[in-house]
Amino acid sequence: MAWVMHEHADVDTLAASVATELQAFCGEAIALRGQALLALGGGRTPLPLYRRLARCPLPWSQVTLLPTDERCVPHDDPACNLREIGAAFAAADGVELQGLTPPNGDPETSERHARAALAQYPQPFDAVVLGMGMDGHTASLFPGVPRLPEALDPASDIDACRIDPQPLPPEAPYPRVTLTAARLLRARSLHLYLSGADKRAVLERALRSHDPLRYPIGAFLHAADARLHVHWSP
């Protein structure tokens, strides 16, 4: 089995439990290597987790956070994942944030910028936190986009690529840059963070499908060489 399910009583328990796990992973990484590296999904669902983790006692100046994906918007735009993550970690004094796009969010240079940024961090992530949309996408790995097979290839040596959702989501109509599945799977711990019955139903369909082009989260649920910890609450 490439995945393991952790069910939590409610969203507060979910956030507290996963924050405790991530704190432990960070502490272990810092003790062993002097640095912890995390890739974090955007959106509203994980923000309580991030705020709780930010209050944990860690040497935050030795922790680096990257988004798993980013919208090609300026860094001060409310739609910017880096901006939201930074706000959620306001209590984590000294934490380092690494963006995937240039400050102006230029779509034409964002892929190159992301690959150069990731080249500074060749080591595996100490933890990755993924979310999942109602269409089964994770990060910005959307079903049906032309570059999806390339972005999901587990043998790829490409760390990031530009994704243009088709059609663009009306709530966030922007080109994206996303970490590839191969880069996200290069992690010491891999977590999917979900809540609600609707998301549980999508998860069950993805588990049955075994087709990551239809449900991109399946590339992580069924990965041969990684174990995905699925954290869910009602």
Residue positions per predicted region:
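Short, conserved loop/helix-junction motifs that constitute active-site signature segments
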Residues: 56-64, 91, 151-153, 182-187, ...
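Class I SAM-dependent methyltransferase SAM-binding "motif I" and its flanking Rossmann-like core
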Residues: 134-182
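Ligand-binding beta-strand-loop-alpha-helix segment within the catalytic cores
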Residues: 2, 61-129
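A glycine- and small-aliphatic-rich helix-loop capping segment at beta-alpha/alpha-beta transitions
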Residues: 52-60, 83-87, 143-152
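Short glycine-rich phosphate-binding loop at a beta-alpha junction
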Residues: 34-41, 126-128
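ATP/nucleoside-binding phosphotransfer catalytic cores, i.e., glycine-rich phosphate-binding loops
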Residues: 180-182, 186-234
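Glycine-rich beta-strand-to-loop/alpha-helix junction loops that act as flexible
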Residues: 40-45, 130-134, 195
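N-terminal glycine-/serine-/threonine-rich phosphate-binding loop
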Residues: 1-38
